[in-house]
Amino acid sequence: MEPLYIVMPAYNEEANIKTTLDAWYPVIEKHNKTGNSRLVVVNDGSKDNTYKMMQEYAEAHPLFVPLTKPNGGHGSTVIFAYDYAIKSGADWIFQTDSDGQTNPDEFEDFWNERDNYDAIFGNRTVCGDGKSRAFVEKVVCMLVKHYFGVKVPDANAPFRLMRADKVSKYLGKLKPDYNLPNIMMTTYFVYYKDRVTFKEISFKPREKGTNSINIKKIIKIGQQALKDFRELKKNL
């Protein structure tokens, strides 16, 4: 048995959610041989019709689980999704975002290599979010190397397949409202010398909706990250 949980956070994605679900639902159908795999989207207190559309989609798609929580940001929503998948009995957790920037056709290459690794992380060699976001990612990788001594090509790609037991182990090191869990997940997997690889993925520009993270927010998050990294380093 290898129950797979594909999990995504969603915030104000009414322009994208239906297309995203249509794209990813066939993936979970294909990998539901045991009957225990699920596609899970966690609504982060959206102010639009995202959650309503999710509920409507679930009526005709039994493998889709729509969840909702008060707004707490992308990081806390990802942690919520990981925790739900673990408690639901997932063996494997695949995380991506609900904005349509990732390609479900690239999932199979990850899945087919799962037996060789504890985690397979996406590597965005071309970032559809533009040069500023690509620069931010390079800075993140430099900081991860500086604080934790690990070298990674992409610390935060929202396209990652991980063993649930490992995610559970590392999730316990993070507060429920921590805002950069994927960066730390990547860091932990590499730092503790788990079997890890990075695979190149495509990453399209956002076609619809508005990115809730702008440069001003990135700077604020970055300032907090420096403090958090110092504290998290003490607990390695």
Model regions: which residues?
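Hydrophobic helical membrane-anchoring modules
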Residues: 1-3, 173-236
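Hydrophobic targeting segments
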Residues: 2-8, 17, 24, 37-42
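Short beta-strand/loop segment that forms part of the nucleotide-sugar
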Residues: 8, 32-46, 67-70
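Short, well-formed alpha-helical segments that are part of the catalytic scaffolds
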Residues: 13-30
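Donor nucleotide-sugar binding loop of glycosyltransferases
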Residues: 13-16, 46, 74
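A conserved acidic beta->alpha catalytic loop
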Residues: 43-52, 100
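Acceptor/aglycone-binding surface of glycosyltransferases and processive sugar-polymer synthases
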Residues: 69-87, 92, 104-179, 206-216, ...
